[in-house]
Amino acid sequence: SSAEGATYKVGICQLVQHPALDAATQGFIDALNEALPGQVTFENKNASGEANNCGTIVNGFVSEGVDLIMANATAALTAAASATADIPILGTSITAYGVALDLDDFDGTVGGNISGTSDLADLSQQADMITEWFPEAKKVALLFCSAEPNSSYQIQEVATCLANKGIETKEFAFTDSNDVASVTQSAADYADVVLSLIHI
């Protein structure tokens, strides 16, 4: 709850400009402005796709003594979690908090000063969709970025779901934009269906 007339400063760290991330940030700003009209100022920073910039941005927020940090994307969340155990942190556009924060025995609650929302889709539904749309498919290529922990996590989960349906899977990992085209071609050559699990 907010004290009548109190003002709050919120630092927003967004990994990269992207329509989905931009919408999440704007929705957060709109919701706080609606809940606390005229009481919140925002410092909205974009890391330009560089995870190291997230650390610099968040450390700046900590030095300024912001009241809340909103971390938009996994790199922003991990930077915020490393920077402070005191300032409340809200994450958004995070697929798997347990993976992002390297938590053993994650039960769905981070605890401490961290909370937020997840964008994790139901992976069993994705497996169901593949068998519904491509009933003759025998092999599925799982395309993902090896540098993104959320993608790796989802690959493992969806591979299990597809194996339970008797479908063979093979992982095709790329490291960055330099090898994505060749890896994607290899995946297409191997499989009846290519499932891309790429995150920001």
Feature annotation, model-predicted:
Residues S1-K9, N33-P37:
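Short, low-complexity disordered leader/linker segments with a strong preference
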Residues V10-Q14, F28, S115-K165:
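An alpha-beta-alpha
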Residues T41-S63, A173-A187:
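Structural motif
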Residues Y8-I29, E43-N53, E148-S151:
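Extracytoplasmic "Venus flytrap"
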Residues D107-T117:
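Rossmann-fold dehydrogenase core element
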Residues I198-I200:
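Conserved small/polar residues in nucleotide/adenosyl-binding loops
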Residues N46-D105:
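Beta-alpha junction/loop-to-helix N-cap segments that form part of ligand/metal-binding clefts
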Residues A20, A24-F28, N53-I57, N72-A76, ...:
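Stable alpha-helical elements in mature extracytoplasmic
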